[in-house]
């Protein structure tokens, strides 16, 4: 074996290194012979370590067929010959494919054979090969695989992109080239020129291999795109354009509209429907499903029926299996891969959270170093049963599944229920509100705890003496206070057997078996004021009377028994104990006239004016006053200027001028006396309980139009007179039980006739008060304990009201006719709702003494009562327009202005017909006007 020289070895090593570099940069050869030769060289790489193999290329591009082994002595001659050849001839052109194939074939034929060739020719061939390869690489756009370069020296799949030489390789090549002793100056200059051109040439910007990355080394496909500075600011924002405003005509800067990307900070990801967490059933009957952030309606999307949903799952693109319905918008939303993964894990009984570690290290709570024994109630590991599907839940689910398969449960049937009909039973679901279970069993009542008498050593006061023991034995079992005899024992062990034990157990069983039980719900009330109804403040219910404005003082301080106000509200008439009726001017409190109702009667028969009532019609101005055995009809001439006259009732005499008119020529007086000439019989009927008589001329000149004398001695004690709303009928009441059918008489003023609606009256029945219904032909008759409602047209009893009072004293009917207020001598006031029940709707007890009078206001929602305790109670009483609205009854104020004399206080009370004013009559001899 010939050993190469050191110079040739160095040059061969440098040439081999450069050849290896260039070989990696060669494009992939399409010639199969080339691939085979390269493979052969790769396989024989281990055998070429001792000798260096260089190929000498001839002028015609073919390789030499012989391999010469040269000694060290022949190197100089060979180098000289090569220098001469380089000076004479140009560097030949090399066919890369032919040279590679020939070399590979020679390597296959003679593996392991190595020959050293002329180093200068080899260097020139290597340089030419490299230049050709650079030209080919510049036009190539393929890359390379770095892993292949690292794994082998020769790679058939090497790419063209590795044009850049490593600086270390360049330095090594330059050192090896300069160390060659046979290198000519020309070859050195050429090599240096190539190296300088390689590093000083401008890279091709359009080359894909050089422009694949930016200055930061980031691929341009992944890096942020550069923006044009002509339309963008340095910070990236868009530049505005100056345009003239169409509204103001001024120049303004207009910016381009921002197109919000998916990852931009915008509101595109906010929910469209902004109604919040409210039941969506509220929008079932509406065309929209909610509202957006601007308040516009979010319309319901088109919904698919069951057939469309089925077709989507069969013929669709498969999205139906990965979609879910969004209740807030009504649309089908495609589930993300993460959400689908969670669903699959839940179906497979897996843990949805990948970050959760189900097999974390066990913590020993009781043993170990630095461990203090402690309870594991709060920190013990979870048992395995909590992570295993429940068998019982599986059974419940399968029960529902079987019911669905059998048709007993229809999914989605609740949404397809028919709408509630227009007319339905409002109490149909009343049983659903009953929270009690039908199978609930009430607990048995507990036995009473034993007392001191049942002790084996009871105190001496519980022991019976002989007399008590004898009485206990003689008494019946149900009359005994206790069913055993107390016995004293020295000790508990001396107590014998109880002989009645079996009997008591048997009776206990009978009680549990037969006795009915009732559950009483105990109210847990911390504040008793919560039980009181929430009433409106009296300040919100104004106006109502609160103060005294006018005092109508009667002479001699006699009691004012009664009073009444004319329909115009300008005049007030009162009746006193002295038997006189007085007319008052409401505004100034002046007494304008006075009449002695008992005039012409014996002194023994004189009495107080018990009742007085003004005719309710505004066509005539007259009133009636009641004394013992007489009813006086008075038409005061002082009030005729305020009365409306009727053309049919006014005669030619009364139609004269007011200067010549007298008390007997007024319209009211003529109306009261018009039927006297035609209806009054020549001889009074002895069987009639009433006699219509003409007053004296002196009385007629004062305005007294007619007297009604009660002929029946038993019915002479008249107490009440009441007018009908039309002003033609009035009724009188005698409360004596001996009056019989004459206790109630109805009189017709226009015909001067009187009659009793009751032909027969039960013995002992006494009528206390009477009022007419405001709109119907009914009368309310109050006895001592009951109120009966009669129909005068049908002559029948309609209803009987049970007051629950011991003695009824007064009553009044509401202007609507559906409510009644009743007062009694036992200090109670009852409100009746005639449409509700025969018993009181409300019972009030605010007075300390008997209630004398009660009255409703016809213009205001006010009611007042008078009592013997000297006070008046005001109430706000509002009645609902329909039957579903409850009564509102609110106490307003207590009026105190009358003195109590001889046990009597306020005797009568009346409301002003138009104003919220109140008139009261007291036993102190005064009548008061209460105003706001």
Swiss-Prot record:
Spell out the residue ranges that the record assigns to WD repeats: 555-594, 604-644, 762-800, 803-842, 846-885, 901-932
Q: Where are the transmembrane segments?
A: none
Q: Where is the composition biased (Low complexity)?
A: 1-18, 175-184
**GO BP:** maturation of 5.8S rRNA from tricistronic rRNA transcript (SSU-rRNA, 5.8S rRNA, LSU-rRNA); maturation of LSU-rRNA from tricistronic rRNA transcript (SSU-rRNA, 5.8S rRNA, LSU-rRNA)
Q: Which domain of life is it from?
A: Eukaryota
Q: GO CC annotation: what is one?
A: PeBoW complex
Q: Which residues form a coiled coil?
A: none
Which intervals carry biased composition (Acidic residues)? 57-119, 150-172
The question of whether DNA damage is a record keyword is answered with no
Q: From start to end residue, where is composition biased (Polar residues)?
A: 27-36
Stretches the record annotates as Disordered: 1-229, 679-698
Cell compartments where the protein resides: Nucleus, Nucleolus; Nucleus, Nucleoplasm
What GO molecular function annotation could you give as one example from this UniProt entry?
Answer: ribonucleoprotein complex binding
- The protein's predominant localisation is nucleus
Q: What keywords appear on the UniProt entry?
A: Nucleus, Repeat, Ribosome biogenesis, rRNA processing, WD repeat
Q: Does the keyword Nuclease apply?
A: no
- A Pfam family the protein falls into: BOP1NT
Function, as annotated: Component of the NOP7 complex, which is required for maturation of the 25S and 5.8S ribosomal RNAs and formation of the 60S ribosome.
Complex formation: Component of the NOP7 complex, composed of ERB1, NOP7 and YTM1. The complex is held together by ERB1, which interacts with NOP7 via its N-terminal domain and with YTM1 via a high-affinity interaction between the seven-bladed beta-propeller domains of the 2 proteins. The NOP7 complex associates with the 66S pre-ribosome.
* Family note: Belongs to the WD repeat BOP1/ERB1 family.
Under which name does UniProt file this protein?
A: Ribosome biogenesis protein ERB1
Please tell me the species this chain comes from.
Answer: Mycosarcoma maydis (Corn smut fungus)
